[in-house]
């Protein structure tokens, strides 16, 4: 089944790359309007639609010039590969640090990108929660309910989706909290993924499968995606906050080589820096992401469960180590899910 998903993801990726390359998506138009392109991961589209408007307004009032921001969304890993393969974009706002390191390793992003902006270039965070249908018919209360018989789980493919990698590590954090041996932890994860019935290439695809197509009993989801679904379909879904999850830290970076060629280095930096402004941080909270500004985060204490025990990626040795251990070819995910 996963081969079909990989074929679909590859086809969509090819179409996206061609469309962006053919549009000539960055630089300065004849009327003086500056255009930059932001390649992002799946569930951020609604946030960046709003953010781009407030940034465009800010930029024009600050500089007296118009700016147009083009945005592209898909599975984070697939998006990163599209940039490496030639998509001419100025900034990336991806699901995990490893995806930006992939672009850095190609030479397109300068070393040290993670220190260019505050909080390790992560202007917002999130976590992973469980979304169930109204009434919670399968009585899901924590991760251990996802390994029971007759529970159909929806989650995307870690081979193409950064969010899926966070999902995997959130579940593994529960296993590590409750089981001492690696054998027990792997057994738990194997049982969970045996219950996964559909594995889409990205987080938004999995939401569509669960919500619009009515597949599955529980969706492993970004917290912001679950909150958006609750707002869009009032009375139809419930969020189950697990006892243990992971602190998900999406990362942002300038694609330095492209931005220099396009003459957009300064505006690209300003675009990402403005994510830390009070106005943007407020919008981040309203959009279901957790602001890095603690004072603004506290305004949303009724929206987010701040009592979930959150593991950090550092507990796994950082993203490079975690990716090798769990998501590379032949790593734990392949061991438990099969080829």
Task: Spell out what each predicted region is.
Residues 1-12:
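Bacterial N-terminal signal peptides that target proteins for export
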Residues 20-24:
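C-terminal motif of bacterial Sec signal peptides marking the signal peptidase cleavage site
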Residues 25-106, 116-117, 222:
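Early extracytoplasmic/lumenal segment of secretory-pathway proteins
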Residues 31-33, 64-66, 78, 86-88, ...:
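Extracytoplasmic
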Residues 104-176:
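A conserved helix-loop-strand patch within extracytoplasmic ligand-binding domains
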Residues 259-339:
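Extracellular/periplasmic juxtamembrane helices and adjacent flexible linkers that interface
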């Amino acid at each position: 089944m996963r081969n079909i998903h990989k074929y679909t993801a590859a086809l969509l990726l090819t179409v996206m790359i061609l469309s962006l390359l053919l549009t000539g998506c960055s630089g300065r138009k004849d009327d003086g309007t500056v255009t930059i392109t932001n390649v992002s991961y799946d569930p951020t589209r609604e946030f960046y639609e709003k953010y781009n408007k407030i940034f465009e307004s800010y930029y024009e009032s600050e500089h007296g010039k118009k700016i147009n921001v083009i945005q592209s969304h898909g599975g984070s890993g697939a998006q990163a590969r599209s940039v490496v393969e030639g998509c001419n974009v100025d900034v990336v706002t991806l699901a995990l640090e490893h995806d930006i390191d992939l672009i850095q390793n190609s030479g397109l992003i300068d070393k040290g990108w993670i220190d260019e902006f505050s909080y390790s270039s992560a202007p917002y965070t999130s976590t992973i929660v469980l979304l169930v249908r109204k009434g919670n018919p399968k009585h899901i209360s924590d991760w251990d309910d996802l390994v029971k018989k007759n529970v159909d789980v929806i989650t995307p493919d870690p081979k193409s989706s950064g969010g899926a990698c966070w999902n995997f590590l959130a579940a593994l954090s529960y296993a590590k909290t409750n089981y001492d041996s690696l054998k027990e932890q792997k057994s738990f994860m194997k049982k969970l993924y045996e219950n996964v019935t559909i594995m889409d290439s990205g987080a938004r695809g999995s939401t569509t499968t669960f919500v619009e197509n009515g597949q599955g009993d529980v969706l492993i989801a970004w917290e912001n995606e679950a909150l958006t679904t609750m707002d869009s379909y009032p009375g139809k879904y419930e969020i189950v906050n697990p006892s243990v999850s992971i602190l998900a830290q999406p990362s942002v970076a300038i694609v330095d080589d492209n931005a220099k060629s396009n003459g957009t280095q300064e505006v690209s930096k300003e675009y990402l820096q403005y994510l830390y402004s009070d106005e943007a941080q407020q919008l981040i909270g309203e959009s279901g992401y957790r602001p890095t500004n603690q004072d603004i985060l506290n305004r949303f204490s009724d929206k987010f469960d701040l009592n979930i025990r959150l593991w950090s990626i550092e507990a796994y040795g950082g993203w490079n180590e975690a990716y090798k251990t769990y998501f590379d070819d032949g790593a734990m995910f392949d061991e438990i899910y099969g080829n």
